[in-house]
Amino acid sequence: KNGYQISISPTLSYRLIYQTPEVGLFNKCDFWMRSDSVIVINIRGTIGKTESWLENFYSAMIPATGKLQLNDSTLFNYKLAERSNAYVHVGWTIGMAHLVPFIVKQLNELYKTGHKEVIIFGHSQGGAIAYLTRSYLEYLPETQLPKDIVFKTYCSAAPKPGNLYYAYEFDFVTRGGWAFRVVNSADWVPETPLTVQTLDDMNEVNPVVDYKSSTQSMPWLVRMYVNSAYKKMDKTANKGVKYYQKYLGNTVFKQVQKTL
């Protein structure tokens, strides 16, 4: 009508080929095969279960490389970044840790039939787990996953899965347009979890970190004022970290532990 197309028919179709069981804190993902043979991993977001929301609130930070004791019998080794100062959200790392054994197994099976192009997608909580899953797959040795699989990642309305140094690492791994984060600027989810920045989080070359040296040439009165102000701000930030660890770390951990 008037030269415009009334409806658009999809040029590609998708077929569900595998679903993981619900694991961890009600985490789940699907494997779809696109009509052009590209594999799409769709990671589910938060659902209306207390355990699923606990995963979001369990937002203490852990090193991006380490071990997680998932339960009495399962120790999960993971590497999500090269940087020692990269940290990630513990709740979503737990979700990722429960899903990736199924994901890796399916990818290896699909690889045997020639499928080497994979899209990783997740919305909301699923978007955060999609970030971490992509990072995990990047650092798996070739004995566990072939290195010529091509991944592209789409994170829709995803919250922040790690700190700034994890973000730097993820950006480098997916450089060249191999990852996209799609957000609505008015959405509150990408603003979470709450973050607290201290002097310890900054690069050593930042003059703010070594503010005492930076103020040596200032007049005595100015130097005393700056030192006093910095100490108060740093003390407030560190106090915020302690509350964060207490309520969004230790307290939530007790509830998560009961579930797992």
Residue ranges and their predicted role:
Residues V23-G24, I129, G162, T174:
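Short, glycine/acidic-rich beta->alpha junctions
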Residues G122-G126, A130:
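Gly/Ala-rich beta-loop-alpha elbow adjacent to hydrolase catalytic centers
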Residues N42-T46, H123-S124, S156-A158, N184-S185:
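Active-site-proximal beta-strand/loop segments in catalytic clefts of secreted hydrolases
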Residues S52, A130, Y165:
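Short glycine-/acidic-enriched loop or helix-start segments at secondary-structure transitions
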Residues L12, I17-V118, T143-L145, V150, ...:
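A conserved cap/lid and substrate-binding interface adjacent to the catalytic center
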Residues L132-Y136:
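Active-site signature of alpha/beta-hydrolase-fold catalytic machinery across serine-
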Residues P101-E117, Y139-L260:
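Serine hydrolase/lipase
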Residues K1-S7:
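Charged, compositionally biased non-catalytic regions
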